[in-house]
């Protein structure tokens, strides 16, 4: 991703050739590959026909399952209210054994993201129930007996997975799988429900530090849009195909425009936060100076400014920004941002 002059902000989906490589210009930056941390980029790259093999390899590697074949299914479900007519997953698919996989990219923090995953799992069970009931009715068999196939709700989190905070060191720092179990013995219910949270925010390895295919998958998903080439260490591995599929030049104009709108919307939100932060700084400065106190004025100004910044940082986090995103905007260390949001 490189800076480039952008004369129009109307989404056009057009490509430019630079040294034999096609890039898309969005808000003055060059993108060779889609940003997979955005819902739209994630769905276009991993949720369209032709991506089944890539998605299969990704899930097998991160979940430790043995998927042989995947089939995309409709990602729409009836909504809870008249205003919200449908719930839409990023990706919904089944394997040949009937196991269901709901895959979501969550770019903004949500207070109840864990409960949202539970809700999505219930929709997958409901879908299996309806299909099985209809099948057995056609075959003149008895009603469905609640024996649903395994289901996985896989959430890629571009914010901190707070469910892991304070936990003992895990063998896998980035992928957490939850199942129903007895609270005293830990024995699993074995109903087939799997809630998987993949913490991209916690993953901070460089490409040179990636020493496994799992690391390469996580690195590539998190940093795809920043690349101009497929890294040497990724070439020849199962992850290389992800780079080929994510090339914007290989997408339709409609897909590129959709992705461009998504990037612009995110940039607008981030710019709004930056403006709010600057306004808070000026407001605090004016308030302290207006008090006209000769003694302790400098100290009061510093304290007031810090208080104002802390307030804005908390607002940014409440509205769904990750710790890393906030740190990038306010130009402060990640650990300091973490401490402020926990105050």
Predicted regions and their residues:
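Short, charged alpha-helical interaction segments and adjacent helix-coil junctions
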Residues: 2-31, 101-106, 208, 215, ...
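Low-complexity, glycine/alanine/valine/leucine- and proline-rich hydrophobic stretches
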Residues: 182-200, 212-224
